[in-house]
Amino acid sequence: MSESKLDVTLWPSVNQLTNPLVKHLVDNAKALRLLVEKLPSGATIIDAGIKAEGGLEAGRLIAEICMGGLGHVNLHSSSTFPHWPWTLSVHSNNPVLSCLGSQYAGWSLSHEKFFSLGSGPGRALAGREELYKELGYKDSADAAVLVLESDKVPPQEVIEKVARDTGVNPENLTFILTPTRSLAGTVQIVARVLEVALHKIHTLHFPLEHVVDGAASAPLPPPAPDFLIGMGRTNDAILFGGHAHIFVKGSDEAAAKLAKELPSSASRDYGRPFAEVFKAVNMDFYKIDPMLFSPAAVTVTAVESGKSFIGGKLDATLLDQSFGYSA
């Protein structure tokens, strides 16, 4: 593995940055329709969609926590997709740290029948993933927060593991639970539209140190009570409706190549709603082409020349099919 060329000396603590955001959730739990519980271990559970109603605003705030306090998530109207007027727009001025170092759901947590992928700042304290060796970044903080796309409270064994791996006492740990079928869960997944672009940039071996800035948007899908359909819709919002604008250093040739390879349509599995693709491989994620997970359209701007390169396309027809619209 090559040594990181990223300059992380001025990178802040994502856990320290999110402490005030987590406090805001707790202090405004009733207004946000959240349930807050202290477990016997001392850990705090924020329910954003299991017993609690949650909602769009809760999901928006949770998405900003996922981004380590380095991202802004906005919900606004848009005419891009006439049947789906609400859009999530995401921006980070440090997309590598915010999206890969914090937001990416890369920490596998399991015990007996419980399984969830942890995302958010707590990952950067544990540093359990190979990704952190590549980034050359490890956080330092006295409190940590993780977001779990789960409809179950993590068992004591998982909480103990997180405390052990992060070096944080359980009473300073917060777990935010956002089931995929919930409104908050839907928002925080679609708000990963910039993150999936960064993850694919990393997969394509484009130099992360050349990524200067980034912004992206994707339509807000209707939630679904069925897990598979709900998961499919949140993925398809990005695969068919996501548009990322990435600002990079380096040659025009490298920027043009990235614009061509980055969109979801560059994948062999593109062309059907995600739920259908998932069923076709017997619900085995590892059989899906990893190049599929990216925004539908991309704009890559080479900041040193000022030239921009366009790749992919938005697909309203496939989006309507996935979201359950019938004329």
Swiss-Prot record:
Keyword ATP-binding: no
Keywords, in A-Z order: Cytoplasm, Hydrolase, One-carbon metabolism
EC number: 3.5.4.27
UniProt GO BP: formaldehyde catabolic process; one-carbon metabolic process
A Pfam family assignment: MCH
GO cellular component terms, semicolon-separated: cytoplasm
Keyword Cytoplasm in record: yes
Primary subcellular site in the record, as a coarse category: cytoplasm
Matching InterPro entries: METHMP_CycHdrlase
Molecular function GO terms recorded: methenyltetrahydromethanopterin cyclohydrolase activity
Localisation per UniProt entry: Cytoplasm
Alphabetical list of SUPFAM superfamilies matching this protein: Methenyltetrahydromethanopterin cyclohydrolase
Pathway(s) this gene product operates in, as recorded in its UniProt entry: One-carbon metabolism; formaldehyde degradation; formate from formaldehyde (H(4)MPT route): step 3/5
Catalytic reactions on record: 5,10-methenyl-5,6,7,8-tetrahydromethanopterin + H2O = N(5)-formyl-5,6,7,8-tetrahydromethanopterin + H(+)
The protein's enzyme class: hydrolase
Top-level taxon: Bacteria
Family under the similarity heading: Belongs to the MCH family.
Protein role: Catalyzes the hydrolysis of methenyl-H(4)MPT(+) to 5-formyl-H(4)MPT.
Protein name: Methenyltetrahydromethanopterin cyclohydrolase
Source organism of this protein record: Methylobacillus flagellatus (strain ATCC 51484 / DSM 6875 / VKM B-1610 / KT)
Gene: mch
